[in-house]
UniProtKB/Swiss-Prot annotation:
Record-annotated TrmE-type G domain positions: 219-376
Organism: Chromobacterium violaceum (strain ATCC 12472 / DSM 30191 / JCM 1249 / CCUG 213 / NBRC 12614 / NCIMB 9131 / NCTC 9757 / MK)
Entry-linked PROSITE patterns: G_TRME (PS51709)
Localization annotation: Cytoplasm
Upper taxonomic lineage: Bacteria, Pseudomonadati, Pseudomonadota, Betaproteobacteria, Neisseriales
Name the record gives this protein: tRNA modification GTPase MnmE
Length: 450
């Protein structure tokens, strides 16, 4: 990268807050061998080997003991000299070691600054850098494996392959601009439009994989709504496989929203159980009902629960009418164990209808499968990498530019410009074409020490 940064020495605790057996201080900067010698009492650590040593303060008194590792740049995570101090994991000990690092000239690192330096020093591209945070934040094994694929460059290789094809096609198209009277014949002979169509097909494949990766990262927010005592809390417990919410036969037991994250086939699903919807004079219950509608506004999908013995009553119809028209929903007819109906999937008024029993779990797997289908998840295979919404936006813009390029290919200057814009959009993913403010936003969301 050609973006500049101040080459100050930075330091941070790289392990999680709290007490533990081991705590790690990470330091990055230029020419850190004297730094390592000062904190270890004059020892010269062998690069990429663990050196057992005491860690000393400015007066020669030991603060802690443990392992010192020295990674000379550029063969390090950040591309600079990197030191790791692996001591005991107590907060007080780590605070003393961090203060000693500051005494030796380091400053406290900003969130994500180590990874940002790795990006700026061409150790990682931007998609790989983001996957560091995604791997840390992964809420399922599938998401973690996909994030690791991105960190190892699976997503970046796909993008670089598309960009390379675009560059070659641009070179061909722009070379014809000097020969306007022959440019169309030249492009036809070179099969420019055929190459463009193949490129668009490749992009569609990458886009589909990226969408699956984005679902693994973002998951979906599902709100449970319905009248009191229709089994919303029981269904939440059935989906979670645990007793998350209190369940009684008393209508109105749930008076506030209860949130739980579960994992369905590797996809994080944020379930929100809500207060039952009914007319009430109870002040507390009214507040809970208002929060129910607030949760509905923020949800990706609604599960409208109905007592299968009663069906779509006038009260249920009023709830249906208030749901946002654009909000996807599934009508869940619960308590089939009491109504005598069979669990299964159907459709009503253009929306899915699932019959189940939250108490016996009969039909719950049908609902889980339907949720994944509605969010567009087809299952993670070995090739799925994790992606973010900004990646999907960039791919969509590139696809739009390639569509325009094909439509206007006989106007060669427009053809060339649309190819350039498509290349720029894709290059935003890996960071070859990114604004400083975008980088600031991305790395500010990392934890300190990464």
């Amino acid at each position: 990268m050609n973006l500049s940064y101040t080459p100050a020495t930075i330091c941070a605790v790289a392990t999680a807050p709290g007490r533990g057996g081991v705590g790690v201080i990470r330091v990055s900067g230029k020419d850190l061998l004297p730094f390592a010698q000062a904190i270890s009492g004059g020892k010269t650590p062998k690069p990429r080997y663990a050196t057992y040593t005491d860690f000393f303060d400015a007066h020669g008194q030991a603060l802690d003991n443990g392992l010192l590792l020295f990674f000379p740049g550029p063969n390090s995570f950040t591309g600079e000299d990197v030191i790791e101090l692996q001591g005991h994991g107590g907060p007080v000990v780590l605070k003393m070691l961090l203060a000693r690092c500051v005494e030796l000239g380091a400053r406290l690192a900003e969130p994500g600054e180590f990874t940002k330096r790795a990006f700026l020093n061409d150790k990682l591209d931007l998609a790989q850098a983001e996957s560091v945070a995604d791997l840390i934040d992964a809420s399922s094994e599938t998401a973690a494996r996909s994030a690791l694929k991105s960190l190892k460059g699976a997503f970046s290789r796909e993008v670089h392959g598309l960009v390379d094809e675009l560059i070659n096609l641009r070179m061909l198209v722009e070379a014809t601009l000097d020969f306007p009277e022959e440019e169309i014949d030249f492009l036809k002979q070179a099969d420019a439009i055929g190459r463009l169509r193949r490129l668009r097909a490749q992009l569609v494949g990458v886009q589909a994989t990226a969408k699956q990766g984005a679902i693994l990262r973002e998951g979906m927010h599902v709100v449970l709504v319905g009248q009191p005592n229709v089994g919303k809390s029981s269904l939440m417990n059935a989906l979670a496989g645990d007793d998350i919410a209190i369940v009684t036969d008393i209508a109105g037991t749930t008076r506030d929203t209860v949130r739980e994250e579960i994992v369905i086939d590797g996809v994080p699903v944020h379930i929100i159980d809500t207060a039952g919807l009914r007319d009430t004079d109870d002040v507390v219950e009214k507040i809970g009902i208002e929060r129910t509608w607030q949760a509905v506004e923020r949800a990706d999908l609604a599960l409208l629960l109905v007592d299968s013995r009663e069906g779509l009553t006038a009260e249920v119809q009023s709830i249906l009418e208030r749901l946002p028209p654009a909000l996807p929903r599934v009508q869940v007819f619960n308590k089939v164990d009491l109504s005598g109906e069979a669990a299964g999937l159907a459709e009503q008024d253009g929306h899915p209808l699932v019959r189940l029993s939250a108490r016996t779990h009969d039909g719950v797997d049908i609902l889980k499968a339907k949720l994944l289908e509605m969010i567009g998840y087809s299952g993670a295979d070995e090739g799925v990498f994790l992606a973010r919404q900004r990646h999907l936006d960039a791919i969509a813009r590139a696809a739009d530019h390639l569509e325009l390029a094909e439509a206007d290919w006989e106007q060669v200057e427009i053809f060339a410009e649309e190819l350039r814009m498509a290349q720029n959009a894709l290059s935003e993913i890996t960071g070859e074409f990114s604004a400083d403010d975008l980088l600031g936003v991305i790395f500010s969301r990392f934890c300190i020490g990464k």
